[in-house]
């Protein structure tokens, strides 16, 4: 049996990007976006869960929401880098989707996740 879950959260945060080209994104600005975390396992924990939704929310939303991402994260806070950070930050997370704004979406997928992707959400 494979168990999957997803947790979607709204995130409001500011950042500026360090880029190799001229861009208005190099100036401090904010986003009201959305993050979805996907987790899976073939063995539920002792409480009968993949992972507690509150744990995911506390770790991601509680850390990033209304924060300055440049101060909170040790990397250039692009949507792609944030998605990768989430995958590495949450146990059993195999995919993270970061919607920085309408139409702008980045995703990171753990290509070494031990469950066959065809069984995942």
Place the predicted regions along the sequence by residue.
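Charge-rich, low-complexity N-terminal segments
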Residues: 1-121
